[in-house]
């Protein structure tokens, strides 16, 4: 409900990006990679403000080329591999109207290592492989548009909450906004809302909390 009106679906996209690692995890050379990521972010801001189709195509080609170069520095799926290495299963997440939940099933003797990875992951957001992740988000959007239940729910929420984000925007966002993403807005949203007083950790199972 707190996603900016001009970039709906932002919270859900951020959820995806938090599986891409951190400054330490998911890269072979963070200093080089962050330069390329900043170039991509800057180009997306220009892209969003450009209406001329030929100019947009040229900018997108630049984004595509730099994204490819940046992908050579990144280590894909390293977060997932780090969780598998400690015996974790069920790595997942979902975004709803009021919260985003991240889920792991971890061995009781790996709680400390799990916490160490999370303590690095959440504050050190890296919008790594941002360009290619759009494809996964588009696919989710397409699946939702083909789902009658979801379509009915969107219409119902729009009727019930005509002046509230519950009804004026959807969790996954509009096609227009997905086609014109803002890495800058995602970073700012993360800095504002992914803070200790907005987060909680719920744990259950055979472990010693002390």
Regions found by a protein language model. Name each.
Residues 1-34:
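Active/ligand-binding-proximal structured segments within catalytic/core domains
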Residues 27-210:
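Charge-rich, well-structured scaffold segments of protease-associated domains
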């Amino acid at each position: 409900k707190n996603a900016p009106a001009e970039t709906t679906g932002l919270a859900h996209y951020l959820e995806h990006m938090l599986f891409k690692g951190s400054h330490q995890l998911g890269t072979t050379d963070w200093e080089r990679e962050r330069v390329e990521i900043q170039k991509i972010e800057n180009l997306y801001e220009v892209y969003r403000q450009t209406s001329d189709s030929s100019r947009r195509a040229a900018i997108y080609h630049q984004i595509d080329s730099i994204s490819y170069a940046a992908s050579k520095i990144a280590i894909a799926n390293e977060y997932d591999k780090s969780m598998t290495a400690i015996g974790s299963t069920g790595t997942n997440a979902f975004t709803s109207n009021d919260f985003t939940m991240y889920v792991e099933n971890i061995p009781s003797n790996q709680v400390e290592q799990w916490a160490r990875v999370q303590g690095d992951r959440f504050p050190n957001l890296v919008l790594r492989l941002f360009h290619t992740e759009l494809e996964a988000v588009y696919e989710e959007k397409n699946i939702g548009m083909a789902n009658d239940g979801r379509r009915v729910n969107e219409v119902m929420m729009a009727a019930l909450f005509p002046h509230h984000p519950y009804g004026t925007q959807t969790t996954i966002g509009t096609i227009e906004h997905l086609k014109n993403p803002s890495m800058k807005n995602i970073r700012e949203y993360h800095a504002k809302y992914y803070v200790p007083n907005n987060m909680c950790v719920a744990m259950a199972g055979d472990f010693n909390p002390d």
